[in-house]
UniProtKB/Swiss-Prot annotation:
The gene is SCGB1D4. This is Secretoglobin family 1D member 4. Belongs to the secretoglobin family. Lipophilin subfamily. Its main location: secreted. It is found in: Secreted. Pfam families: Uteroglobin. PANTHER family: SECRETOGLOBIN FAMILY 1D, SECRETOGLOBIN FAMILY 1D MEMBER 4. It comes from the Eukaryota. Residues 1-21 form the signal peptide. Seems to be involved in the regulation of chemotactic cell migration and invasion. It comes from Homo sapiens (Human). Keywords: Secreted, Signal. GO terms for cellular component: extracellular space. SUPFAM superfamilies: Uteroglobin-like (SSF48201).
Length: 83
């Protein structure tokens, strides 16, 4: 699963890259919800895409891991790509 998350991040970086190197607002919103909001908010956001249950379960599993990161470090992650 770690490889799939890495591949997803690389894919998003390549697909959403713009000449001025700003993060695509949709990606920024997705990552912000993922890092800072509850499981219910993530469920609502992912439900728009109608994913298979396994994909949703995998995303929530990764979210539970990222929830272990301190708030301060998650905030610094956000600041590094949201300028």
């Amino acid at each position: 699963m770690r490889l799939s998350v890495c591949l997803l991040m690389v894919s998003l970086a390549l697909c959403c890259y713009q000449a001025h190197a700003l993060v695509c607002p949709a990606v920024a919103s997705e990552i912000t919800v993922f890092l800072f909001l509850s499981d219910a908010a993530v469920n609502l956001q992912v439900a728009k895409l109608n994913p298979p249950p396994e994909a949703l379960a995998a995303k929530l599993e990764v979210k539970h891991c990222t929830d272990q990161i301190s708030f301060k470090k998650r905030l610094s992650l956000k600041k590094s790509w949201w300028k």
